[in-house]
C-alpha cells in the first residue's frame, strides 16, 4: 500500500508541474501573440486601404477574368453563372475587409488603454512607428533598458485586454 500511494503522489506532482509549466507557456504565448499583432497593425491598415480600393474597383468593373478570387470558385467542378461568381467574390472581399476592420478596431481599443502612460512612446515607437530603442530612450530621457522594461509592462497590459485571464496564467 505504501508503494501505490507513493506512485499516486508522484503522478499528482507531475500533473501539478505540467499544469504550472502550461500556465507559464500560456502567458508567454499571449505576450508573443500580442507583439505579433502590434507589429502587424501598420501593415494591416495599409492592406485595408488597398482592399477597399480593390472592392470599389471590383464593384465598378467586375472581376478580372484570371483573378485568383474567381478561380477559387470555378475549379471545384460546379458550373456557376457569372452573377453567382461575382456575388461570391464580392461576399468574400467584404468578409475579408470586415475581419481586418475588426482586428484594427480591437487593437486600437487595446492600445487606447495604455495611451495615457508616460512610457506609451516605448510601445508605439517600437511596434507602430518602427523607431529604434535608443531614439525612444533619448526622447523619453531614460536608458534603453528602461524603455524595454516599460514596453514589456505595456504590452502585458495590452495582452490582458486582448486575451483576458489567459494572459495572466
Question: In which residue ranges do the predicted regions lie?
Answer:
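N-terminal interaction/assembly modules
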Residues: 1-114, 160-169
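Secondary-structure boundary/capping motif
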Residues: 44-47, 118-122, 147-148
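Short amphipathic alpha helix immediately N-terminal
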Residues: 114-131
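Helix-turn-helix DNA-binding module
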Residues: 129-145
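DNA major-groove recognition helices of helix-turn-helix
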Residues: 147-161
Amino acid at each position: 500500500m505504501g508503494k501505490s500511494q507513493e506512485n499516486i503522489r508522484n503522478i499528482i506532482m507531475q500533473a501539478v508541474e505540467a499544469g504550472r509549466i502550461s500556465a507559464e507557456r500560456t502567458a508567454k504565448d499571449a505576450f508573443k501573440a500580442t507583439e505579433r499583432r502590434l507589429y502587424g497593425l501598420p501593415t494591416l491598415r495599409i492592406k485595408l486601404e488597398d482592399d477597399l480600393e480593390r472592392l470599389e474597383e471590383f464593384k465598378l468593373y467586375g472581376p478580372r477574368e484570371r483573378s485568383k478570387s474567381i478561380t477559387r470558385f470555378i475549379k471545384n467542378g460546379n458550373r456557376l453563372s457569372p452573377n453567382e461568381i461575382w456575388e461570391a467574390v464580392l461576399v468574400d472581399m467584404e468578409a475579408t475587409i470586415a475581419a481586418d476592420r475588426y482586428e484594427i478596431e480591437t487593437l486600437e481599443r487595446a492600445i487606447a488603454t495604455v495611451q495615457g502612460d508616460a512610457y506609451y512612446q516605448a510601445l508605439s515607437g517600437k511596434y507602430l512607428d518602427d523607431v529604434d530603442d535608443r531614439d525612444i530612450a533619448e526622447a523619453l530621457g531614460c536608458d534603453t533598458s528602461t524603455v524595454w522594461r516599460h514596453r514589456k509592462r505595456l504590452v502585458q497590459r495590452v495582452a490582458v485586454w486582448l486575451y483576458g485571464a489567459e494572459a495572466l496564467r
